[in-house]
């Protein structure tokens, strides 16, 4: 199911202007196992808050339903996706000087394809609520946190560390 905001997510202002309404839509990341299985659908509206300038979704859907066990993507199966992610990591390595033991994090790491593309000896962490089903594709030098990313979860796992680089696609 879903909930709807009545205040801006940043400023808490109630001044919200509807910019786009797509009507009822099915959750696109849900893949039913049979034609009889119900898939949640609901409104998709973008609202803008002139007070903060934030364009935001009016609705929030259940994360567990959107990103449950039937969700996930194996980037490693698609050669063009692997090349794209490797190029992305090469670009980031040129922009950010990474040293050995620097902490790099990929939020929504799927099958760890991005993390495997790093060329250095870094501490690599994948955070993904569906990661367990792809665990076999994680090499021994990649830590998987099979959960949704929150600052609190990160701090619980790395209380005295700061990530040098964080990615999410």
Question: Where is each model-derived feature located?
Answer:
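N-terminal juxtadomain amphipathic helix
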Residues: 1-79
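Class I SAM-dependent methyltransferase SAM/SAH-binding core
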Residues: 111-153
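A conserved beta-strand element that flanks and buttresses the S-adenosyl-L-methionine
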Residues: 164-167
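Conserved alpha-helix/loop element of class I SAM-dependent methyltransferases that forms part
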Residues: 83-101
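Short amphipathic alpha-helix with an adjacent loop that forms part of the alpha/beta core around
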Residues: 152-161
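Conserved class I S-adenosyl-L-methionine
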Residues: 99-110
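Acidic active-site catalytic centers that drive phospho-/nucleotidyl reactions
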Residues: 21, 106, 128
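Short loop/turn motifs at secondary-structure junctions
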Residues: 12-15, 100, 120, 162
């Amino acid at each position: 199911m879903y909930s709807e905001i009545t205040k801006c997510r940043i400023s808490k202002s109630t001044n919200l202007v509807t910019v786009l309404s797509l009507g009822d839509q099915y959750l696109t990341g849900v893949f039913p196992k049979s034609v009889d299985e119900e898939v949640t659908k609901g409104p998709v509206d973008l609202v803008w808050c002139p007070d903060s300038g934030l364009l935001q979704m009016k609705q929030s859907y259940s994360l567990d339903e959107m990103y449950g066990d039937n969700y996930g993507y194996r980037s490693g199966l698609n050669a063009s996706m692997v090349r794209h992610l490797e190029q992305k990591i090469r670009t980031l390595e040129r922009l950010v000087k990474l040293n050995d033991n620097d902490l790099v994090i990929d939020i929504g790491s799927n099958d760890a394809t991005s993390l495997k593309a790093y060329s250095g000896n870094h501490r690599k962490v994948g955070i993904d609520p569906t990661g367990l089903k792809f665990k076999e594709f994680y090499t021994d030098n990649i830590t998987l946190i099979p959960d949704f990313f929150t600052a609190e979860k990160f701090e619980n796992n790395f209380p005295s560390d700061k990530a040098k680089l964080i990615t999410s696609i």
